[in-house]
């Protein structure tokens, strides 16, 4: 009896390229699902302790606060109401 055919790559390359051969997706953060709880907790604390320091022109400098920090919503609403009241008062005159 003759041996049977085991494998063929006929037409496979064309089929593979039809939708394009894409690179595998690299995720920024790997899942910690199923990891031992104690190990995961230790990793979290270790990550906090090894934060990268910010360098500017080779010297250590403090991270400066923003020039215009974000205002609380109450302050923004109060300013808008005051502006609207001023417009109404100017319109009545």
From Swiss-Prot:
GO biological process: cytoplasmic translation
Key words, A-Z: Ribonucleoprotein, Ribosomal protein
Family matches, as Gene3D superfamilies: 6.10.140.1730
Entry superkingdom: Eukaryota
Any one Gene Ontology molecular-function term assigned to this protein's record: structural constituent of ribosome
UniProt-annotated stretches for the region Disordered: 1-33
CC terms in the record's Gene Ontology section: cytosolic large ribosomal subunit
Similarity section: Belongs to the eukaryotic ribosomal protein eL29 family.
Protein's UniProt name: Large ribosomal subunit protein eL29
Classification lineage: Eukaryota, Amoebozoa, Evosea, Eumycetozoa, Dictyostelia
């Amino acid at each position: 009896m003759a041996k049977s055919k085991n494998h063929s790559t006929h037409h496979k390359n064309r089929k593979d390229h039809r939708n394009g051969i894409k690179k595998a997706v690299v995720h920024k953060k790997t899942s910690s699902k199923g990891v031992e709880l104690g190990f995961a907790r230790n990793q979290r604390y270790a990550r906090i302790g090894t934060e990268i320091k910010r360098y500017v022109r080779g010297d250590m400098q403090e991270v400066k606060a923003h020039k215009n920090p974000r205002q609380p919503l109450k302050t923004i609403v109060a300013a808008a109401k005051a502006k609207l009241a001023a417009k109404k008062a100017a319109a009545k005159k």
